[in-house]
């Protein structure tokens, strides 16, 4: 039975009912709806709507229903209820009779659903933070095992300067740390309880909303009833955080795809996260990484869709806001799946020490060291930059690395270059010199790994 039928003289058309009903997706809020209802039943005792005995009967029935939901949430979908609120109330009435009809006193589905989705989002934030931390720990572990693996660092996908695989891993640790922090920030802002705001103007019962908020594990009650039932900032903020984090994961996946390619051959992905070809028997495709990269669009699409949904809505609640759920459910599921899969990808990764070093020795990635060397000899940087550029052109022409040129060849471009130049052109020297905080020197990378391990205990 609909919760609003008294005003109407005609039955709802089935076409509209199918279009309007949301149980097929908001059933995921069943636990939150039940927990919120238990909290509301306690509040109704304080304003003499329910007796202590009646409240206990309702709480026992709701707790029983909660156990049933947790054991088989999919069973909800067999029902014909309009939404999860209708379903919970219907099942409650089945258990306790007319007493169940008293529970909705002073409450609207507007503040009810606002509560449910906030409670759900808070729970997902905690779960997502755990997954993000697990990926960070796996990256730190991978970095620790590959501290001395030298590889080329890239700009414009061209070899730029030598780095280590560990330094690359730690770059993603930092990106994910910002994602974790954004989740924490979002949690603090969403930690306000809208229940008791009614349809839009507040409940007519003198309920202590601060006590109600505390009972439902919120930091405080919301301050404005009109805003409370209209607010979907927490959904948009989580979608924004998810979109940005998915962009980080996509970059990670793209790097892994390139590193795994036959052209680079820096890493080998496990058979457990790759697939083959139905035609070409030699293929081993990085599908896990490609799917992470490919799923970014659906998360960003959910953010865009939600922004468009709320941008023109007058206060307060509008049915458009029912469109908030499918996007956030799918986006956060997708994000968590991708974070967990990225962690799994790293579990059995094999890094080729020989191939990465071979690649780092090519591409004149020690050119900046030569420019800095000339600066140390008193040559202005702009001049040294030009000199090294000409030297690289020559080295390419004669098919040599900079470290392979003779002093006589160097003197074609600058007499400031002496025998000590060879020491600074080595890969190890290139790494060691980048010793400022955050740099690629093995000492700094080891410090970063140790600090991260301490932080993520």
Curated annotation (Swiss-Prot):
It comes from the Bacteria. Its EC number is 4.3.2.1. Its main location: cytoplasm. It catalyses: 2-(N(omega)-L-arginino)succinate = fumarate + L-arginine. GO terms for cellular component: cytosol. The keyword ATP-binding does not apply. InterPro entries: Arg_succ_lyase_C, Argininosuccinate_lyase, Fumarase/histidase_N, Fumarate_lyase_CS, Fumarate_lyase_fam, Fumarate_lyase_N, L-Aspartase-like. Pathway: Amino-acid biosynthesis; L-arginine biosynthesis; L-arginine from L-ornithine and carbamoyl phosphate: step 3/3. Keywords: Amino-acid biosynthesis, Arginine biosynthesis, Cytoplasm, Lyase. One of its GO terms (biological process) is L-arginine biosynthetic process. GO terms for molecular function: argininosuccinate lyase activity. It is an enzyme of class 4 (lyase). It is found in: Cytoplasm. Belongs to the lyase 1 family. Argininosuccinate lyase subfamily. NCBIfam families: argH, PRK12308.1. This is Argininosuccinate lyase.
């Amino acid at each position: 039975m609909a919760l609003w039928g008294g005003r109407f003289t005609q039955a709802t058309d089935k076409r509209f009912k199918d279009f309007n009903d949301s149980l097929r997706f908001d059933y995921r809020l069943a636990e939150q709806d039940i927990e919120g209802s238990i909290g509301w039943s306690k509040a109704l005792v304080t304003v003499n709507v329910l007796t202590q005995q009646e409240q206990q009967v309702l709480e026992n029935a709701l707790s029983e229903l909660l156990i049933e939901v947790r054991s088989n949430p999919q069973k909800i979908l067999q029902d014909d209820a309009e939404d999860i609120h209708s379903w919970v109330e219907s099942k409650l009435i089945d258990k306790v009779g007319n007493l169940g009809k008293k529970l909705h006193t002073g409450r609207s589905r507007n503040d009810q659903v606002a509560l449910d989705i906030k409670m759900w989002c808070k729970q997902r934030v905690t779960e997502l933070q755990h997954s993000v931390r697990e990926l960070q720990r796996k990256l730190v572990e991978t970095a620790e095992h590959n501290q001395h693996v030298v590889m080329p660092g890239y700009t414009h996908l061209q070899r730029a300067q030598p780095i280590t695989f560990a330094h690359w891993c730690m770059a993603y640790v930092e990106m994910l740390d910002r994602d974790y922090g954004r989740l924490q920030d979002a949690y603090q802002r969403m930690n306000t309880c809208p229940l008791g705001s009614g349809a839009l103007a507040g409940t007519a019962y003198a309920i202590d909303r601060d006590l109600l908020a505390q009972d439902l594990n919120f930091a405080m009650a919301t301050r404005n009833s009109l805003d409370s039932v209209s607010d979907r900032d927490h959904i948009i903020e989580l979608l924004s955080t998810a979109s940005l984090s998915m962009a980080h994961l996509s970059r990670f996946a793209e790097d892994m795809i390139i590193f795994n390619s036959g052209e680079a051959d820096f890493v080998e992905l496990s058979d457990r996260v790759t697939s083959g070809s139905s035609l070409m028997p030699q293929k081993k495709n990085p599908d896990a990484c490609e799917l992470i990269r490919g799923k970014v669009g659906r998360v960003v699409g959910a953010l865009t869709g939600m922004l468009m949904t709320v941008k023109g809505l007058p206060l307060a609640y509008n049915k458009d806001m029912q469109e908030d759920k499918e996007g956030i459910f799918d986006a956060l599921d997708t994000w968590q799946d991708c974070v967990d899969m990225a962690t799994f990808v790293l579990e059995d990764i094999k890094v080729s020490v020989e191939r990465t070093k071979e690649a780092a020795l090519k591409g004149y990635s020690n050119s900046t060291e030569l420019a800095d060397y000339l600066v140390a000899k008193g040559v202005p940087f702009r001049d040294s930059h030009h000199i090294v550029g000409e030297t690289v052109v020559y080295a390419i022409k004669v098919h040599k690395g900079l470290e392979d040129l003779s002093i006589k060849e160097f003197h074609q471009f600058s007499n400031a270059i002496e025998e000590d130049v060879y020491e600074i052109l080595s890969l190890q020297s290139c790494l060691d010199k980048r010793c400022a905080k955050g740099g690629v020197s093995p000492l700094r990378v080891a410090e970063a790994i140790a600090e991260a391990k301490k932080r993520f205990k």
